[in-house]
């Protein structure tokens, strides 16, 4: 074994800002932050529902706060952005073949968005 020190290239914390691909990746992954807030709000709401009508009314008042509404809109936008990037990558990662031919990427992406719309409508009708 050699006593030489291996070469370790210096990297700053912001190395990813210089590369558009990595910047896009970091923005995409950062969309989880507003979703964490949204998930915590839902869990607190579920706990409030169990505690009784007074706690539920208090949670509803909290959710009506304009800052909370704005954060929920940011969470929705982040979720839609994350879904769009996932849907656009899916045909590249797992091409779908029917009758020996690969389906067009646009068809696969539109089918996924159609499924999202159908499930959303179904949930809205049920609830």
From Swiss-Prot:
Q: Name a Pfam family for this protein.
A: Fumarate_red_C
Q: Name one GO molecular function term.
A: succinate dehydrogenase activity
Q: Does the keyword Transmembrane apply?
A: yes
Which InterPro entries has this protein been placed in?
Fumarate_red_C (IPR003510), SQR/QFR_C/D (IPR034804)
Major location (coarse): membrane
Q: Which Gene3D superfamilies match?
A: Fumarate reductase/succinate dehydrogenase, transmembrane subunit
The entry's cellular-component GO terms read: fumarate reductase complex; plasma membrane
Q: Which family does it belong to?
A: Belongs to the FrdC family.
Q: What is this protein called?
A: Fumarate reductase subunit C
> Organism source for this protein?
Aliivibrio fischeri (strain ATCC 700601 / ES114) (Vibrio fischeri)
Lineage summary: Bacteria, Pseudomonadati, Pseudomonadota, Gammaproteobacteria, Vibrionales
